[in-house]
């Protein structure tokens, strides 16, 4: 039988060599201690373990800013992102995704198919002082990249709207803004007066792209003085948050935006539809019964981006964007040029659930990039000299 090899230790006693087990090792076994040579009593070279140094705690290292940023990004979840929007006078929306006037009725029509309480806000169908039957048919037609509509503000009148819908609106978490239209300053003022103080009405959006009968049919929206006049008149009769909707059918939106802001508006919405026509089959006449219609949908997005870009730099009140939003990148584009919120319009006809889905996708996008608030995405495409656009409304002081 072959004799087992013995190792002479420093104490001179023979010991059996330790066996290493495959697949199971400690740190000491994985890295053997260095052996110092020594001559034994027989003159043969043996080895002894080097003197072990006492273990000391490794000092904590300072994390680099980049590492800290990565760790912060990992900690943010979509539910942690602040999505609230302050439009002034106490109007704080739960998130920046609203639905546009004329595409969502009065909200109740979509209650069975859309989680209404998850929307940032609802701009209801245009409301006038008296009932309107609307324009002659045809009223709507599809176009490449959008649609033309000429509904003509069909609605039952402000009193009927309040009676039929306000009680329901008052039970919703989502704020409802009543879109108001008129043919004279008096019309706008009287509708606003009747809406003031009504439970369920969170604010007013003025549609000033209407012909001013007292000024020969000139639209309020295309003249700075007329736009300021109607805005100031409404401001005097209500403390409700007041948004004013801009028309893209002008050469320069900036003086009009400034005039409206100076007249007391709390926020701007942009844009209303572009004016256009379609030709009927056979080409014997225009297709729409009223000849002219409003163009909306993806085709108007570049125009809307331009108007928002200019308005956001011209005023110090929030801008809410509208025009061609069909997916999250559209929302991000409008935020980048200075919008603090967006309204989804024409796309709702194809997919009523789109606005709620955009709320989730925007929160996920913010969390993915480590943003604690969606407002970190606002104004990133504006020139540096313009400064940061307004992301908060004016505080109301009665």
Task: Report the location of each language-model feature.
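Alpha/beta catalytic cores of nucleotide-metabolism and tRNA/nucleoside-modifying enzymes
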Residues: 1-24, 35-42, 48-81, 295-316, ...
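N-terminal capping/small domains of soluble enzymes
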Residues: 2-44, 48, 53, 58-176, ...
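Acidic-and-aromatic substrate-binding clefts and catalytic sites of carbohydrate-active enzymes
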Residues: 105-106, 186, 350
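Short amphipathic alpha-helical segments
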Residues: 110-112, 135, 192, 281-282, ...
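Predominant activation on well-ordered alpha-helical scaffold segments within soluble catalytic domains
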Residues: 111, 159-162, 166, 189, ...
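Short gly/pro/ser/thr-enriched loop/turn and capping motifs at secondary-structure boundaries
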Residues: 128-133, 211-213, 275-278, 349-351
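C-terminal helical cap(s) of enzyme catalytic domains, especially alpha/beta-barrels
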Residues: 134-145, 279-293, 348-371
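Alpha/beta enzyme core
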Residues: 171, 183-320, 326-333, 337, ...
């Amino acid at each position: 039988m072959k004799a087992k090899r013995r190792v002479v230790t420093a104490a001179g006693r023979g010991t059996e060599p330790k066996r290493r087990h495959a697949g199971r090792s400690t740190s000491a076994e994985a890295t053997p201690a260095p052996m110092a040579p020594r001559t034994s009593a027989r003159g043969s070279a043996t080895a002894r373990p080097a003197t072990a140094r006492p273990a000391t705690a490794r000092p904590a290292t300072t994390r680099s800013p980049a590492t800290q940023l990565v760790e912060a990004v990992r900690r943010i979840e979509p539910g942690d992102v602040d999505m609230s929007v302050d439009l002034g006078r106490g109007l704080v929306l739960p998130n920046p995704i609203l639905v546009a006037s004329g595409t969502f009725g009065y909200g109740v029509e979509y209650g069975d198919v859309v989680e209404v309480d998850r929307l940032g806000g609802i701009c209801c169908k245009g409301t006038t002082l008296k009932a309107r039957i609307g324009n002659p048919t045809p009223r709507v037609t599809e176009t490449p990249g959008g649609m033309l509509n000429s509904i003509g503000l069909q609605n039952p009148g402000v009193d009927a709207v309040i009676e039929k819908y306000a009680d329901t609106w008052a039970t919703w978490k989502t704020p409802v803004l009543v879109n108001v239209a008129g043919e004279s300053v008096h019309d706008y003022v009287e509708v606003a007066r009747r809406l003031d103080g009504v439970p369920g009405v969170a604010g007013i959006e003025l549609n000033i792209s209407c012909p001013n009968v007292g000024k020969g049919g000139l639209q309020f929206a295309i003249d700075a003085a007329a736009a300021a006049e109607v805005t100031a008149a409404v401001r005097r009769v209500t403390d409700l948050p007041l948004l004013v909707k801009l028309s893209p059918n002008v050469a320069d939106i900036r003086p009009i935006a400034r005039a409206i802001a100076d007249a007391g508006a709390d926020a701007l919405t942009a844009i209303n539809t572009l004016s256009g026509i379609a030709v009927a089959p056979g080409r014997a006449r225009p297709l729409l019964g009223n000849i002219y219609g409003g163009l909306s949908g993806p085709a108007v997005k570049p125009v809307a981006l331009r108007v928002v870009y200019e308005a956001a730099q011209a005023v110090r009140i929030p801008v809410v964007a509208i025009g061609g939003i069909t997916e999250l990148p559209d929302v991000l584009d409008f935020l980048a040029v200075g919008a603090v919120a967006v309204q989804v319009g024409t796309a709702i006809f194809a997919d009523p659930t789109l606005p709620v889905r955009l709320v989730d996708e925007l929160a996920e996008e913010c969390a993915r990039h480590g943003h604690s608030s969606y407002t970190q995405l606002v104004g990133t495409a504006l020139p540096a000299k313009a400064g940061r656009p307004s992301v908060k409304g004016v505080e109301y002081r009665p």
